[in-house]
UniProtKB/Swiss-Prot annotation:
InterPro entries: Ribosomal_uL15, Ribosomal_uL15/eL18, Ribosomal_uL15/eL18_sf, Ribosomal_uL15_bac-type, Ribosomal_uL15_CS. The keyword Glycoprotein does not apply. SUPFAM superfamilies: Ribosomal proteins L15p and L18e. Residues 1-57 are annotated as: Disordered. Binds to the 23S rRNA. This is Large ribosomal subunit protein uL15. Residues 23-35 have a biased composition (Gly residues). It comes from Acaryochloris marina (strain MBIC 11017). The gene is rplO. One of its GO terms (cellular component) is cytosolic large ribosomal subunit.
Length: 149
């Protein structure tokens, strides 16, 4: 092999099939489409999902509004406005909120949302938070620390 005359590997390229050029050519008369039927007519093939006139699967199955994510994370959420009930400079964790009675059910790691106003400086330790929630916590003189890596 030389760089000035590259050739494809032998057997890797096939000749184009010429159909309808007589029986001796191998693809004469019906051109490989068989005898009769829908698949031998012009305008074939049928569209994807076509089942010969039967009500197709995509019409038999009901329309679903959404689908559930397999690995969806479930968070225990709290809005920033609810944190005003806590003492200044206190640590805010899921356990401390459960002890104070602000959160009643533990649905997973804590996520802080940004609805409401915060006037107390707090040290928030949560798995996740929205950007507006972090801005409000730091704006009130507190700090946010992520517990998830």
């Amino acid at each position: 092999m030389r760089l000035n005359d590259p050739k494809p590997k032998t057997g890797s390229q096939h000749r184009r099939r010429r159909v309808g050029r007589g029986i001796a050519a191998g693809q004469g008369a019906s051109c490989g489409f068989g005898m009769r039927g829908q698949k031998s007519r012009s305008g074939r093939p049928t569209r994807p999902g076509f089942e010969g006139g039967q009500n197709p699967l995509y019409r038999r199955v009901p329309k679903l509004k959404h689908f559930t994510l397999i690995n969806q994370k479930q968070y225990t959420t709290i809005n920033v406005g609810k944190l005003n009930e806590l003492k200044a400079k206190s640590d805010v964790t899921l356990e401390s909120l459960m002890a104070e009675g602000i959160i009643t059910s533990n649905d997973g790691p804590l996520k802080v949302l940004g609805d409401g106003e915060l006037t107390v400086a707090l040290n928030v330790q949560a798995a996740a938070a929205t950007q507006s929630a972090i801005a409000k916590v730091e704006g009130a003189g507190g700090s946010f620390q992520s517990t998830e890596s």
